[in-house]
Amino acid sequence: MSKDLDIVVFGASGYTGKLVVEYLKNEYGENGSLKWAIAGRDETKLTAVKEEFSLGNDLETVIVESDDLDSLDLMTNATKCVLTTVGPYQLYGSKLVESCARNGTDYVDLTGEPGWMYEMISAHSKEAKESGSRIVFSCGFDSIPFDLGVYFLQKNMQKKYGKTSNKIRGRVKAMN
């Protein structure tokens, strides 16, 4: 099946989804070099997003339910990448990751749920590799503190020992 869309923003009517829509509109317009669409479960809310950002009827709207694998497959077969803001991901993201991995569609989210990420990697990494799907978790604020910690650690390892670490393990602990 031809993947006519470059990106589908799933969860476009939520707060973070609207930020993504605004960015894509400002950077690429609705008929620019990037072919993108908005998706969610409520057509009325998606229409309101189009009106809020003065997006015309040419911008495709995809109605999809996060627990309906058939509708997710239709979406993931039509695009190269799904950027999802629909969380919590452990409740609403598992079937989407499965669909992307199976259909060779890239997946991007901004989760901060490490246990769920581990489950998804364990369940879908082999199929994603075989299909060419790239699964990218935590692409946003939730990952920044850990990324900065790794950067600081590697910088100090290089300074003190003359080399960086090949492997760094982290853990998430309750913050009271």
Pin down the residues of each PLM region.
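ADP-ribose/adenylate-binding Rossmann-like module
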Residues: 88, 99-117
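Conserved Rossmann-fold cofactor-binding substructure of NAD(P)-dependent oxidoreductases
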Residues: 62-92
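Structural motif
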Residues: 6, 80-81, 106
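Conserved glycine-rich Rossmann-like NAD(P)H-binding loop of the short-chain dehydrogenase/reductase
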Residues: 29-45
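N-terminal Rossmann NAD(P)H-binding glycine-rich loop of SDR-like oxidoreductase domains
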Residues: 5-28
